């Protein structure tokens, strides 16, 4: 006996109109057997397996602290006598061109991202190095490789005084090749020639500041410098309070 069964097309047609064929009616499977898993189940398992990484809290910047730090630096620089304000790189070059090596001054930077620039006479002529400000500290601008070794200071005068003392120690040392001051690049803003040329490294030597003629330092200030060079702590001196306060207003040797 031969059993005749309808082809696929009729079966498909029957399924399309909603009638189930006889061979399918005998297979009564529960509807929940083949339900797919949601993608969220896999994601939840993956999240549970991997430990959560602690988020780094962003460093809070105190605007008032920055303002006080910058104001204190400006106050120190005005007292120093070797802060030249808003002169240009060309004017600084003219002032330092005939000065001995190691003569320096501090001026306002022409770059909008920097506050100050250190102009110094080197063996290659007047050179300008920007002074960075970040996190209430100042440091000399440098390339990425030497930046981790560059020290930071609470004000510009402390920064300059440190490198002046380092150069003086190098001069007194028996090893002339010992270099305490780092090799720093010439900023693009003040580099001679094409500003697109890459900055080149130069070894700084800070010896003496170039004092402005218009800001002649008083005899009191010169005496204060001598006292600061000879005395570590002015509080130990038997001085009147007013005189001690005057010494604290500029606790530097330059």
From Swiss-Prot:
Q: Which PROSITE patterns match?
A: SH2, SOCS
SMART domains cross-referenced by the UniProt entry = SH2 (SM00252), SOCS (SM00253), SOCS_box (SM00969)
> What InterPro entries does the entry give?
CIS_SH2, SH2, SH2_dom_sf, SOCS_box, SOCS_box-like_dom_sf
Q: Which GO terms describe its cellular component?
A: plasma membrane
Q: Where is this region: Disordered?
A: 171-195
Q: Which GO terms describe its biological process?
A: cytokine-mediated signaling pathway; intracellular signal transduction; negative regulation of cytokine-mediated signaling pathway; negative regulation of receptor signaling pathway via JAK-STAT; protein ubiquitination
Give the pathway listed in the UniProt entry for this protein.
Protein modification; protein ubiquitination
Segments passing through the bilayer: none
Keyword Thylakoid carried by entry: no
Gene3D superfamilies per the UniProt record, alphabetical? SH2 domain, SOCS box
Disulphide bond pairs: none
Query: What is this protein identified as?
Result: Cytokine-inducible SH2-containing protein
Gene that produces this protein: CISH
